[in-house]
Amino acid sequence: MTDKRKDGSGKLLYCSFCGKSQHEVRKLIAGPSVYICDECVDLCNDIIREEIKELVPHRERNALPTPHEIRQHLDDYVIGQETAKKVLAVAVYNHYKRLRNGDTSNGVELGKSNILLIGPTGSGKTLLAETLARYLDVPFTMADATTLTEAGYVGEDVENIIQKLLQKCDYDVQKAQRGIVYIDEIDKISRKSDNPSITRDVSGEGVQQALLKLIEGTIAAVPPQGGRKHPQQEFLQVDTSKILFICGGAFAGLDKVIGQRLNTSTGIGFSAKVKGESEKATEGELLAQAEPEDLIKFGLIPEFIGRLPVVATLSELSEEALIQILKEPKNALTKQYQALFNLEGVDLEFRSEALTAIAKKAMVRKTGARGLRSIVEGALLDTMYDLPSMENVGKVVVDESVVNGQSAPLLIYSKPDAQVSGE
């Protein structure tokens, strides 16, 4: 490599590609009788990157996984929710098959199938969407429906969702149009009341109306910097009909709406059949019977429900399922903490009764799988604080008493004569 000096013969050196002298560039790289400057190297890299981007969609189309393959991958990361995984696998496969073959097949227009996930907090709605996007290697972004408002009001515009998706793929419109958008807390934008009000519902029905076109498919004009504060900027045109929208929510109280409908259909008065405690359906069983009319009664407008034709319900996770979640998935929580401790050169062991205690705590808190990390973090906090300052610790053992806060983890030292229990 040469610097900005003449060579041994006193001759001024020039880039063989752009013709700039060594005084006009930062570096010249020498080859056999040729030179290339740093600017030309950067330009070559940009050209190669652009060509690779053009090849990616073709490669993705040829590698579209089958519903069985999608389901198998979800099984590696998500415990339970078998029906929801099957529904998602088919819907995602059909969506990307539609993109691969265009919007029509033999003259038949293929409709867009967005997805609605209904299930309690911590049941795996967000994890399913994230895992799908990661497996398919497509851009993914999340939005919180509670922060969205109608255009012109304080809050996020619905177009900001697409702007976030563009950010995830460096404003590559073609790549963004193959992405997945997950809108969480969709139940929180339900209509506040069935009765018309003088006060405009800018965060409820108004947001549903604003989301309609975006979810169904429209050409969204999105500024690179987001918002409407810079109208002079050139807007990016994004076709949202190619983006898969997955909406999720807990829909607290929907089970009661469904229960009322089912009870009404069994008769009233003396002809009504009174069910015993053993015959009463669980919340998960009721949610699985959700119909569009129930969602309308809950507060979603009919047009919005029509844009989400694929509905999958997730049941509340049992204690056994939570124990499986702790130890079985590829990125299970216990495996994550074991990897963290291994970075300190220490083994970490969770005894079976400890996993049961963690699951029981999560059940009491009603936080589902989402609450598992905070419980494990609380049990290991003091140990993780002290461990980097300690020497000769070879293993840390967590049992039920540690999870319940009755004792500290058992520390096993690498020296045989130095085994102690927690302080």
From Swiss-Prot:
Residues annotated for Zn(2+) binding in this entry: 15, 18, 37, 40
Transmembrane segments: none
Domain of life assignment: Bacteria
Any one of the GO BP annotations: proteolysis involved in protein catabolic process
Annotated Gene Ontology cellular component terms: HslUV protease complex
InterPro entries for this protein: AAA+_ATPase, ATP-dep_Clp_protease_ClpX, ATPase_AAA_core, Clp_ATPase_C, Clp_protease_ATP-bd_su_ClpX, ClpX_bact, P-loop_NTPase, Znf_CppX_C4
Keyword set includes Zinc: yes
Signal peptide (from-to): none
Function field: ATP-dependent specificity component of the Clp protease. It directs the protease to specific substrates. Can perform chaperone functions in the absence of ClpP.
HAMAP family: ClpX
Name used for this protein in its record: ATP-dependent Clp protease ATP-binding subunit ClpX
